[in-house]
Amino acid sequence: IFSTAFDEKIRKKAREYTFKFGNQLVKEGYRGYFELDFLIDQKDGEIYLGECNPRVTGASSMTNHAAFAHADAPLFLFHLLEFSGIPFDIDVNELNNRWADADNIDSWCQMVIKHTDDNVDIITEAPESGIWHMNKDGSVEYNRFDYHRRAVESEQEAFYLRISNAGDYRYEGADLGILITRGRAMNDKFKLTKRSKQWIDGIKAHYKAKPLPKAQAVEMSDPAFKIL
């Protein structure tokens, strides 16, 4: 999340499409949280609907914890309000306009760290969930426990949510955990920054694993059934 991720024309069109889609969902009887994924043509800036997620998603924490949401209310609170039975009247346009103000958008990034080696082993040690700190040499170390990303005080800190723990299998494509930090993870050419690579390498360095046990041959016995 950062205020200049897309130009105002694209942001305005995405809001309009989302508003129309949401109104149609209401007509269909759907209530509560939903998220839309858009595809953007980089040549002409045209946007297309990618998919609708009628649920909380992996990106929900980014928007629910953003500065604009904290200034009013997390999006998930509106989801709960919808099913609470409590009558409410919200000026949606006023809310959207305030949240669209660049001054109310702070910069955060989220990375899902995966195991990318072509092997399978068993994890014996895994980094704790909580706040991690990056040292001057690019290494990272566990600093303190917290479950809220707002506890991250600078770009030299990150919140890590562990997914793969000791005893789990580690294989190519396995999700190791989710890292959230201030600032940007990629540059304008969609390449990981040096800092992002250091975070990924640093977290991975705290995983230890052992090889899979060798398979043992099972002695075959005579069949215990007959076909007559």
Task: List the model feature ranges, each with a label.
Residues 1-228:
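ATP-dependent carboxylate activation and anion-phosphoryl transfer catalytic cores
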